[in-house]
Amino acid sequence: MESSDAKTVLVVDDEPEIRKLVGAMVSRFGHTVLTADSGEHALTLIKHGHPIELLITDVIAPGMSGPMLADKLSALHPGLKVLYISGYDNSHIVKKYVVEKGHALLAKPFTVDALREKIEALLGPVPTTKSV
């Protein structure tokens, strides 16, 4: 892996198991991973100087929704890529938050390969030579 190819990915989910699992997968792909259990926690991380290239967040979350978080982080990091993960397959979510804003959506449950494909579509090839 060439470290210059690695991107920093912020994984935000209020469910610890999902946050840990997605973070582990993204790390195995060769990226640097930051995690947060809420939108508020994510904003604190970013305001303390942690640059990110990709936000992976649930659409529906207590406190601050994924789209609201994405809007706030995009204001701080123009060009931020966003991947929503959701158990809801709702066409208005897809239209409003994915198509109109150029973000991506991955339906739960998903496979490692599906996650890798979405990340590659947003950030380019995953910078690893290891088999995942």
Where are these regions (language model features)?
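Charged docking surfaces used in two-component/phosphorelay signaling
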Residues: 20-28
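Conserved sequence signature across two-component system core domains
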Residues: 12-13, 36, 55
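Short acidic/polar segment at the start of the alpha1 helix of CheY-like receiver
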Residues: 15-19
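Acidic catalytic/metal-coordinating carboxylates
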Residues: 37-41, 65-69
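Active-site residues of response regulator receiver
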Residues: 58
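Receiver (REC) domain active-site loop signature in two-component systems and cognate sites
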Residues: 61
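Short hydrophobic/Thr-rich beta-strand motif most characteristic of the beta2 strand and flanking loop
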Residues: 30-37, 45, 106
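Alpha4 helix (beta4-alpha4-beta5 surface) of REC/receiver domains from two-component response regulators
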Residues: 68, 72-75, 80-107, 113-120
